[in-house]
């Protein structure tokens, strides 16, 4: 079951994000899309959103998922070229540091693994990071 978006309007989803949403839904996991924390913002003051937040039955946060499109790894004019890449990577770093500081499991799925996305793939990444 998906819950309302937190932090604003849903941005256009990529194929990888759509696939992740389908896996989470089919598995019956409770999740929210575009999840944000009030104290995690970009250098411009905008909330930094995670693609998915997955919750347990008590609605406590279990882990976060970020699908890393090509714009996370190389400059693309559609995403602001080199400047956009630097901003993206800075924001990615802030998200990783935030999760580490708050003991939150963050699963980052690179676009090169799009074809591998299924329930077992996601859960193996979760368990590899100490999930239970």
Residue ranges of each PLM-predicted region?
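Nucleic-acid endo/exonuclease domains
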Residues: 1-132
């Amino acid at each position: 079951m998906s819950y309302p978006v937190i932090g604003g309007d849903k941005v256009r989803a990529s194929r990888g994000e759509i696939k992740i949403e389908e896996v989470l839904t089919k598995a019956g996991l409770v999740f929210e899309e575009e999840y944000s924390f009030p104290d995690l913002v970009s250098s411009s003051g905008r909330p930094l959103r995670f693609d998915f937040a997955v919750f347990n039955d008590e609605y406590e946060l279990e882990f976060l998922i970020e699908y890393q499109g090509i714009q996370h790894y190389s400059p693309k004019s559609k995403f602001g070229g080199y400047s956009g890449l630097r901003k993206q990577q800075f924001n990615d770093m802030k998200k990783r540091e935030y999760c580490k500081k708050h003991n939150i499991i963050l699963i980052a799925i690179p676009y090169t693994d799009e074809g591998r996305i299924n329930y077992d793939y996601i859960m193996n990444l979760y368990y590899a990071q100490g999930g239970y």
